[in-house]
Structures are given as C-alpha cells and as structure tokens.
C-alpha cells in the first residue's frame, strides 16, 4: 500500500530477496513489515539476516515465536484483526504440523488478498471469511498419484497427505471453486512440489474441478515457482 511495504514469510536467502525486490524497484531497506505464517525453515530462512541489517516490524503468533524467540515481535492471534495504517490484517488458523500456523486475509478498501498455504485442510467454519477476495495465494502442493508413486519414504508421504500436511491439487481446486466470487481476479498457485507435481497437472485439475462445479475461469492464473519471480500484480 502507500504506507506499507510488507513481506509474507522470508523463506529464501536475504540475497535472493534483495535481488527480487530490486527487480520491482524496491530497496530491501524500504520493507516496513514482515508477516510470518509459521516457523518451518522454508518460511523463515532469510529472516535472521533481514533483521540483522534492517528493522521491519515482525508479526507472528505466540506459538511461532516460541520457536523463533524474537524479542521485539508483534504477537498476533488467529481471528483477531489487526489494523496497520491503511491495511487490515486477519490471521487465519491453519492445520499444519507447526507450533501455531496461520494464513492471512489482507484488506484495503475494496481490494483483498487471501493467503493460504501449508495446511492439510481449511476449517469449514472459516469459509465465509475466505470468500470472494481479489487475489488468492493458494497452496497446490502435490498430485496424489505422483506423490504415492514417488521414491519418498512412507512417513514423508503420510505427513504430506495428513490433515496437518499440505493441500493436493484436487483439494486446492475444490476450495478455490467455493471461495472465488465476482471480485476474484487473480489466483497464484503456490508451494508447488518440484518432485510430486507439475504445472500441467495443476492446470488440468483446476480446470476439471471448476467445470464440474459450474464455475468459470475468468481470472488470471500465476504459478509461484522456487527460483522464479512472478510478474508484478497491481490490484
């Protein structure tokens, strides 16, 4: 927004974040806020170095901070809205094998972002809070057939499929089909497994589920890939 430049998670190195921000003409020193979903390394890898060089305000749950032990953290609670300048932030409780994982709904005026990743399912009672947002950043972690036939050990397969694991393409597509609304303009597929998923499988699954559910595809689709930046999206 005009007053806030924020990062959601810091899962890559400080150097890579600095480079990616430079591509959109943002200096890393301009980052004012950081929102952390949970403590797993692929979400906090660059946080220590970021805080060594800069002083953004960090928002995270008490459970997550019990692991990170940040002294000046801003503790947030699931389903308790935080208003920061011109931005409203609602932490959403998720089901993941972490201390206290959350997603987020960010709102400013009539534009909103729903950020949901690293969860085994979405709590049904919260669906109404997640409906009809402008942009969805939604986990499409794995294709079930590919995962089950992969060389990954059984315990890892079980962890991923578990209710505290990750969303499959089918699960993600189903949730999106019931969440999207007339305000929805963008979908970013995220947390995509390099070993157990493909962009083709994601697209085919989503197209099929949306067709069966009688939903259209009048939105722009992007894929968040590990070593690539998506194009800049202005809501």
Where are the predicted features?
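Active-site metal-binding motif and surrounding structural segment of the metallo-beta-lactamase
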Residues: 4, 13-60, 134
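Metallo-beta-lactamase
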Residues: 60-111
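Cap/insert and terminal regions of metallo-dependent hydrolase folds
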Residues: 124-224
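Conserved beta-strand hairpin/beta-sheet module of binuclear metal-dependent hydrolase folds
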Residues: 1-24, 102-118, 135
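Metal-dependent catalytic neighborhoods of phosphoester/phosphodiester hydrolases
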Residues: 45-54, 65, 197-204
